[in-house]
Amino acid sequence: MAKGKQPAAATTYTHWLVKAEPESRIEKGVDVKFSIDDLERVKVSSWEGVRNHQANSYLRDQMKKDHLCLFYASNCKVPGVTGIAKVVKEGYPDHNAWDPKHPYYDPKSDPDKPRWYMVDVEFVSKLPHPVPLSLLQQLSTLSPSPSSSSTLPESLSYLSPTFLSSLSDSTLLRRGRLSVQPCEEGFFEGVREMGERGGWEDWEWKKAAGAKKGVKGKRAKKEVEEVEEEDVDGEKGGEEGEKEAMGRRSKRAKKA
C-alpha cells in the first residue's frame, strides 16, 4: 500500500526585515520616530508596537536570538533598507499594550493573557548606501539570468542572477505592508551587499522604471507602500481603516 503524503514542514527563517519610521510623528504626545541612527545611539531597543497578527506571530514564535534583521525606513521620502540589526532577546509580552497612555495601547490585551509580543534588537551596522525600495522593485523586473547583467551598469555587476530572482518572490515586494517579515538568506545577503557596495547612483534606473510603470506600476507601488498591515479585530476598509493603521504603524525609540 502506498504511503500517504507527509505534511510539508514549516519554513524556518533566520533572517528578517523590520520597519520603522525615521521621521517625526506624534501619537498621544509621543514622538514615535525611530531611525537606524536612533538604534545606533541606544544600542539595544525593544521592538514594540506591532499590532498585526501575522507580524506578531513572527515576533512571538520565530524570531530567535542572533537572527539578523534588515532595518527598513518606512513612511518617508525614500523608503528602503538603511542598516542591520540583530535579535538579542526573544519574544516576550509587549507591556505597552496595557498602558492607556501609550500610543500602542490595546484595551483587549492584559497581563494575564498577553495579546501582543516584542523582541529586543541590537544595532549591528549602518549601511553606507541605503537601498531604496524603488530600486529593488526595478531590479525585480530584470530576467534572473546571466544575460540580465547586460542591462546593469558595470558597478552593479556583482549582483547575482540568484539574488535577482529572489526579489520578485520576496515578502517585501509581495506583502510589503507587513512591518515585520521574514526574508530568505539570499535576499538578505544581496541587499546587505548592495548597501555596503552601492553602485547604482549614476544608473538612470528611475527613468527606466518610470517609462515601464505607467498607471499600473504606480498602483502596484502604492500597494506595497508603506503602512503596516493592521488587523486588530480585522482590518477596516476605506478612510477609517487607513487612519487606524496610520496610528499604529511606527516603532518608538526607548528613552535614552
Please provide the spans of the model-predicted regions:
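Aromatic- and Lys/Arg-enriched surface recognition patch
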Residues: 84-178
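Intrinsically disordered, low-complexity, charge-biased tails
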Residues: 1-5, 213-256
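Eukaryote-biased feature marking scaffold/signaling PDZ-domain proteins and nuclear chromatin regulators
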Residues: 13, 64, 80-82, 114-116
